[in-house]
């Protein structure tokens, strides 16, 4: 069974975007390539248990095992040595990517306190969108009682769009609630 958002993309969004941007071929229509979730755990330097908890939470949120990220350089001011584990990231593609986007747009974002829509200025100029989440508690898989520290995470949606305008339209069609 194909994902609901994937079917919507093929049957509704693609024809709409072809009409709106006058593409000559349906292959020119921008699509979502991947979604990267990144959780920086700066306090993992002093307590490595914090990193294990962050990895477990990221695994619950994404449905796949995160990659532990390591420091590239030593920074004495942060008591950081090169090669120390300081975060975790997950790259979602295919089915899991569409599942996550569906969950993000329809379940998680509406659970954010006094939510007025996501910023429409967070595009990078090449059609990719970055969204920062202040607390991981907005995701339904995270049990409030088992969380000992509120952590934020970065969500990067990488598209094949050439311009921010095309990318914004694509995400808006997927139901991303941009602020007015």
Swiss-Prot record:
InterPro entries: Ribosomal_uL5, Ribosomal_uL5_bac-type, Ribosomal_uL5_C, Ribosomal_uL5_CS, Ribosomal_uL5_dom_sf, Ribosomal_uL5_N. PROSITE patterns: RIBOSOMAL_L5. Keywords: Ribonucleoprotein, Ribosomal protein, RNA-binding, rRNA-binding, tRNA-binding. GO terms for biological process: translation. GO terms for molecular function: rRNA binding; structural constituent of ribosome; tRNA binding. GO terms for cellular component: ribonucleoprotein complex; ribosome. The keyword Ribosomal protein applies. Part of the 50S ribosomal subunit; part of the 5S rRNA/L5/L18/L25 subcomplex. Contacts the 5S rRNA and the P site tRNA. Forms a bridge to the 30S subunit in the 70S ribosome. Belongs to the universal ribosomal protein uL5 family. NCBIfam families: PRK00010.1. This is one of the proteins that bind and probably mediate the attachment of the 5S RNA into the large ribosomal subunit, where it forms part of the central protuberance. In the 70S ribosome it contacts protein S13 of the 30S subunit (bridge B1b), connecting the 2 subunits; this bridge is implicated in subunit movement. Contacts the P site tRNA; the 5S rRNA and some of its associated proteins might help stabilize positioning of ribosome-bound tRNAs. This is Large ribosomal subunit protein uL5. It comes from Pediococcus pentosaceus (strain ATCC 25745 / CCUG 21536 / LMG 10740 / 183-1w).
């Amino acid at each position: 069974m194909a994902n609901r958002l994937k079917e919507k993309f093929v049957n509704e969004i693609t024809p709409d975007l072809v009409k709106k941007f006058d593409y000559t071929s349906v292959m020119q229509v921008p699509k979502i390539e991947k979604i990267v979730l990144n959780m920086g755990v700066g306090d993992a330097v002093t307590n490595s248990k914090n990193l294990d908890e962050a990895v477990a939470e990221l695994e619950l949120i994404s449905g796949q095992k995160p990659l532990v990220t390591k420091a590239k350089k030593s920074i004495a001011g942060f008591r950081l040595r090169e090669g120390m584990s300081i975060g975790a990231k997950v790259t979602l593609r295919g089915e899991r990517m569409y599942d996550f986007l569906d969950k993000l747009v329809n379940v998680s974002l509406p659970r954010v306190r006094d939510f007025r829509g996501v910023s429409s200025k967070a595009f990078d100029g090449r059609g990719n969108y970055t969204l920062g989440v202040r607390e991981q508690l907005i995701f339904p898989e995270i049990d409030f009682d088992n969380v000992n520290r509120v952590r934020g995470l970065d969500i990067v949606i990488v598209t094949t769009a050439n311009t921010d305008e095309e990318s914004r339209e694509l995400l808006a069609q997927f139901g991303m609630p941009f602020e007015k």
